[in-house]
């Protein structure tokens, strides 16, 4: 640091091209696109620059290296959360084209996604492939599913069948029909493969399956793009790579309190389809079939088929495979609602055990080495399946934790917290020896008509929850895991303004790195203002995703307090700094909601800085509503000063002399 540990740095924002004519700017622009294209340009200085005429606001910042936080920033505060809800997993991460591919509902009945298109179709209830029945296609009978989305690419498929005769699979893609004939000759279920090449992109394809001769029983059909990765959409995975989140929480969320991990392991073609208990209830909850069907139809209409029913195609093994691909730390939430002590213990054995029944069921001999387990989700709330009072739950938590650690004593336990009441205090008092972190969830109110209040809504939620936990932490040195946070009631995709609010909340976590060790934004894909939005053919980074990605890539190491003049009126900007002591670098994060350039310079910074910027023409700009309106740009400047562009989120890295 060259004896500058006590130096007070005063900085004022200056537009970078005000320097000598030798300043060079090299930039790379990236926007979320289907082909991942990017453009780069070298901007040479000119004596007359029209940008100099733009309105610029000068701000003085001061900081001292004596004030560097003693606690390093845990990279897991940039974590994320995926849940089996709506289209987060299925139609988001998972690549399957066929709906209800295992025929959970009898064809043409209840809420089946299949219709009888010709002849008579029965049910084999005596020897079904999986579940309670398998469809029997009698001679010259057929079933159909409409509304399939196919891109202009190659697809691989398969179907299980038994009997003697021929099956015909007819794909109608607009006016073109692609037929595949399969010779079936087996008294037991056998897997038959096929492939098709879609000549065009469409959302109106259909599949008709017909028996051309004697009755044939079918089940578990699948159709996926050839370029899938272990069943996952490659376009979504590439966007997840770009997010660069180091920590993933799964499978819920409210979903987990009705989830049985056994259902999601083993041969995925034989994994059962289940009702999503937390969202649509159990069959016994209804007085009649007609009441249940009416309720299911309503829920499918609002949640989608995969919000109402869980096919269990994406289970624990697939989650671990995804985390491995993304080089991310997995965090598995245990069902402490309707789940049992034995289930919790067995799940840890399945993940980490080297011997035992469940360890032997794992598809690989090596341990998954899952370090972080959460016991339950929001068990403080009466909306949660299995909710009990705090005294009963603390006993349940301790029993679960001891059973799980008897299998692997090295795991870290995240306990259910809620410091908006006395719940967290009571949990820490009773369970401090059986927990390492206390979770906290909050969803901030969206304030559409005032950007400053919109951001402060998130910032103040984070600040309040952290301050309350600080008062509790001393009891047992229990760190905080904010493993769900977002804006509530999000009916639009995540916009630039939402990314700004999320980042403001993250700033509070950075400032309190001695308290907050883990944070998971909710959600990752689709659902509640996902960082990634998908449609049937494309995946896009959204406002929250771009914003968090920029922070994840650049703001690390140690927090450095900084002072500057507060905003006045509805204008809002926010600045945070971190220090990399080994590299003698500081990183400056700026949220600029204004139409002005914020100007920053410091003579003590070395020349040669890098800047990572997210910009939008409007604060409401997003990438999936009206097209790609957000742009992320990385640029290197041979100067010792930077700017914060209007309506932008940026992080600038500068060397300290």
Model-assigned labels for residue ranges:
Residues 205-212, 350-351, 389-505, 538, ...:
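Noncatalytic carbohydrate-binding groove/subsite architecture in carbohydrate-active enzymes
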Residues 211, 252, 357-388, 442-444, ...:
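Active-site groove signature of glycoside hydrolases
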Residues 571-608, 647-653:
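Carbohydrate-binding surface patches
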Residues 199, 225-245, 312, 319, ...:
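An active-site-proximal structural segment forming one wall of the substrate-binding cleft
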